[in-house]
Amino acid sequence: MHKFNFPILSIINSKLIVFTDGFGDFVEKLPMYLKYLIVSFLVICFLLPGIKSIPPLDRDEARFSQASKQMLEDQNYVVIKFQDELRAKKPIGIYWVQSLSAYIFGKESITSYRIPNVIAFIILTLVFSAFVYNIAYRYFDVAFSSAINYSLLTSILLSIIFGFAIEIKQAKTDSILLMLCTIQQLIFWKIYNYGKESWNIYKHNDHAWLVRLFWFILALGILIKGPISPLLFFLTFISVVLLDRFVEKEWNLSWVRLFLWHQGLLIIFVITIPWVYLAWKATDGSLILNAIKGDFINKIKSGQENHWGPFGTYILLLFLTLWPIVLFVPY
């Protein structure tokens, strides 16, 4: 696996030279766990303001939190209801997480239902930091200490993005889903690289836990937001195969075997099917069918939640949603 030497990395390095020279010398002397504790503390400082005082920002947040509160009050952790109606919006996972948080921190305050988002985002920044470190150190001509500095810096920058600052203050699925998808992608990347290094999972069973963890995270993603996690995996898988074939000019699919497909499907089945079965039985199939027909299929057909716009809308919105990281785009 060859390394890449991209000019952009040198440019970014020159722009951050004051930071990396001063702060980097200090950081390098700290133990690794302390570095991540400092980053976590900074992330918390950036994210917590407003989590209690800001009222529900949209209709979905109020309905998610109310449904989770009802689940806790009714002690019914199978059927999702909003007032007297079945709520066929998203699988059960987010309601379990919010109900647990409300049980611990109190069910009356909207803050209790937002806390899982904050925790998920802290984990996300640490996982993303590990991702950046691995990529910078492995694929680019970056020294070990510089890779650590880049990874810590990206975690801090990630936590001050305007779009994320708004999103984590909403009791919805997106922050938790993003955390799970990031972990999923990091593990996928590691498995892929192990395959390229001719790592034989059948001879190194002590590392097979990583593959099982991948499927476990993917299954949790299904419980949080349905098909998004498997769709991300499928698109990533196809993209990597095509890149290997047409960019790397090789057709080596030995890494595909490392995913232990039979075990993976079993893990997904064991984690997701019990709730599907119980919910189907409790509602005579109404909850599951409404979720598939009324939510998932309608979104595909007509953009049920009106998340659409003219071509280029989301590119223009990046200047707002990804501020201030968008300042690095010219480089």
What spans do the regions from the language model cover?
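Membrane-integral, polyisoprenol-dependent glycosyltransferases
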Residues: 2-331
